[in-house]
Amino acid sequence: MQNLEILVRKPTEGEIEYISKEITWESDPCEFDFDYDHNETALVIYGCATLRYPGGEVTVRPGDLFFCPKGLHTHCIVLEKIKKYEF
């Protein structure tokens, strides 16, 4: 069985410039389950969310760059209205 986890770090200036050209996604506070059918990298613009997954949980905030691998099942809790770039 593959060990899937969410990776979170601060992006470089070059990454911010590149990612800021991508599409955005936003949500009001809510909870939902989500299965990643592709690898996704995202940069939080504003807001806050906790992502729970088998083996752990992470909370992402403005300025966080995070990666969710294909096949990961998450329970997302949007704590504050959130907006992110994603690709």
Positions of predicted regions on the chain:
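Short, surface-exposed charged micro-motifs
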Residues: 41, 65, 75
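Short strand-coil-strand connectors
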Residues: 28, 52-56, 79
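Ligand-binding loop in jelly-roll beta-barrel domains
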Residues: 70-87
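Conserved short histidine dyad/triad with adjacent acidic residue
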Residues: 9-11, 18-37, 69-70
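Short, conserved beta-strand element in jelly-roll/cupin
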Residues: 35-50
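Short secondary-structure boundary/capping segments
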Residues: 15-17, 33, 41, 57-58
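Cytosolic regulatory regions built on CNB/CRP/Popeye-like sensor folds
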Residues: 1-11, 15, 23, 62
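Short acidic-glycine-tyrosine-enriched beta hairpin
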Residues: 55-70
